[in-house]
Amino acid sequence: MTKLLDGLGFVELLDTFGDDLTVVNAARVSFAKESVVMEPKDEKLIKYLADHHHTTPFFHPQLRFRLKMPIYVAREWFRHTVGFARNEVSRRYVDDKPECYLPPPESLRERDANKKQGSKPTPIENATGVHTIIKAFQEQAIATYEALLEQKVAPEVARGVLPQSMYTEFIETGSLSAYARLCALRLDPHAQAEIQAYASAVSKLIEERFPVSWRALIHEAAE
């Protein structure tokens, strides 16, 4: 498990299906061929497939993760739909105490006036004061939520007062190809820093299981 942000967020690899050889044999079936062990020619084939956008062999390997991230990060992550299946904790059914991501003062980045979205790498001038404001707001939101539950308000209604900084947790299964597309976009320097952290953690775990394929895919995406 890789802890992220304030230590409450995480990425955990639960399971994988296949390996680099799975990609090779998915491609070689066109010629009724099969490799038993990885050889240099197989590594060259994987690189060729990635370089020339022959993506279907990379759909066969699958990975399953458990992730915990702030809702506002998750909603960006969930924009990636093709090749993924997700099941998320539902606050219609769960009413335990919420957890929120409280960004440290150095993460309260300044708005970039030259961009429609994004931020400068530098924190705002009054970062410590704003940090205190956010902390107080989160505590009040959670207190209000718990007060609504005490008044017998249904969790599906009471959850409406909770902030986007609240953590959510989900299980996600995706193909190697799908994760390559996701990471290519979310590892970009222009992506939000918080989602870059999750993409980086996922990328490292994938590379450990699919080293040849992942290097080929990420290199191709960076071109």
Model-derived regions: residue spans:
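Family-specific signature for flavin-dependent thymidylate synthase
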Residues: 1-223
